[in-house]
């Protein structure tokens, strides 16, 4: 009978697949993590042994902030590469959705390392906006306000704008337009308004119903025209600067992303033709992680694309649509929390 080897364990658990460059098994058969670019391996068995010597017993949560840093750098470098390849003339803004992990050490680490990449934050409620305002982001970093909005949430966002924060309030329901107009008039602020568009395209995987036409949030085509008319009537035509779409989380199939991007690019073009100088497109979340290492669209825990492929599609789609219609390239925002 063949003796079981460490390589057999690596193959059985597909560690080389899902571990990417971060996790692996060393020659002792122990799991290790390589959180930094210097390739220093940290033996997790040694870490646990040391914790027990300090009277810390399992279960414990080990956090590797360097992996967060590396993911930010990876996404930024992918956009830089795509911009060079497709002659993209806009800017890319990485925005972290604070709902993913609101723990102070995590948010502070992301903001601290993300400063050189102009990383911003996304909030989906008034309490989250309070937390975001308290974080010391760069002055030109973007804050995106999504989710259910009442008068107090909107007024807080506009007050933060008066303080110098770069805030976009995204309209997701028709009634929010009146609230924004009233608050803007009361506070004497010209708001930066975004509109969430409910695309016909949807994502794939476990959370596909959180986006696309089945989504609870966003405006359909007919509602979009009504919203634009209302904004014009309230004197806010020039305040409409962003369109936002979200087709779901952990999207497993790159083809679904490509379809949604083409649909969103068409909205971008048509809005420019209607005289709206949209200069930001928020592609929402959905960038998936290959948790099981199979690189397959048939598993809800995997994806059939890389970060670079995702970014290439985002950049190329809007560059192509913009160039064909002789309009400026939009600045692209991504809200990936994974």
Say what each PLM segment does:
Residues 25-102:
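Low-complexity, highly charged intrinsically disordered N-terminal segments
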Residues 10, 166-182, 221, 304-322, ...:
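Phosphate/diphosphate-binding loops
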Residues 58, 62, 84-89, 274-280, ...:
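Flexible, glycine/charged-enriched surface loops at secondary-structure junctions
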Residues 54-56, 287-288, 295-297:
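N-terminal leader/propeptide and maturation segments of large enzyme subunits in energy/redox metabolism
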Residues 87-278, 282, 289, 306:
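Active-site-proximal beta-alpha core segment in soluble small-molecule metabolic enzymes
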Residues 254, 297, 321-328, 333-338:
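N-terminal and secondary-structure boundary signal
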Residues 208-211, 297-309, 315, 338:
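Active-site loop ensemble at the mouth of alpha/beta enzyme cores that anchors a bound cofactor
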């Amino acid at each position: 009978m063949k003796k079981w080897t460490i390589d057999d364990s690596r193959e059985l658990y597909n560690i080389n697949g899902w571990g990417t460059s971060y996790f692996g098994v060393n020659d002792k058969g122990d799991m290790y993590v390589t959180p930094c670019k210097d390739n220093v391996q940290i033996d997790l068995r040694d870490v646990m042994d040391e914790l027990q010597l300090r009277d810390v017993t399992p279960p414990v949560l080990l956090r590797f902030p360097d992996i967060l840093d590396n993911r930010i750098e990876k996404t930024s470098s992918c956009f830089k590469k795509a911009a060079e390849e497709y002659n993209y003339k806009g800017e890319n803004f990485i925005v972290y959705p604070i709902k993913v992990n609101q723990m102070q050490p995590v948010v502070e680490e992301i903001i601290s390392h993300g400063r050189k990449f102009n990383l911003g934050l996304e909030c989906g409620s008034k309490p989250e906006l309070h937390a975001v305002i308290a974080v010391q982001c760069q002055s030109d970093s973007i804050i995106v306000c999504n989710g259910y909005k009442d008068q107090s949430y909107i007024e807080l966002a506009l007050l933060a704008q008066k303080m110098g924060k770069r805030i976009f309030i995204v309209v997701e329901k028709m009634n929010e337009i009146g609230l924004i107009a009233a608050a803007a008039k009361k506070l004497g602020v010209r708001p930066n308004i975004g509109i969430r568009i409910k695309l016909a395209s949807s994502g794939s995987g476990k959370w596909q119903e959180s986006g696309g036409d089945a989504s609870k949030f966003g405006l359909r085509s007919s509602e979009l025209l009504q919203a634009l008319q209302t904004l014009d009537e309230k004197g806010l035509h020039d305040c409409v600067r962003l369109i936002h779409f979200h087709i779901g989380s952990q999207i497993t199939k790159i083809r679904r992303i490509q379809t949604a991007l083409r649909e969103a690019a068409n909205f971008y073009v048509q809005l420019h033709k209607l005289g709206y100088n949209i200069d930001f497109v928020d592609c929402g979340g959905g960038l998936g992680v290959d948790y099981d290492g199979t690189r397959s669209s048939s598993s809800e825990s995997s994806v059939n694309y890389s970060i670079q492929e995702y970014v290439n599609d985002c950049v190329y789609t809007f560059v192509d649509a913009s160039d064909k219609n002789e309009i400026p390239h939009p600045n692209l925002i991504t809200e990936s929390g994974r």
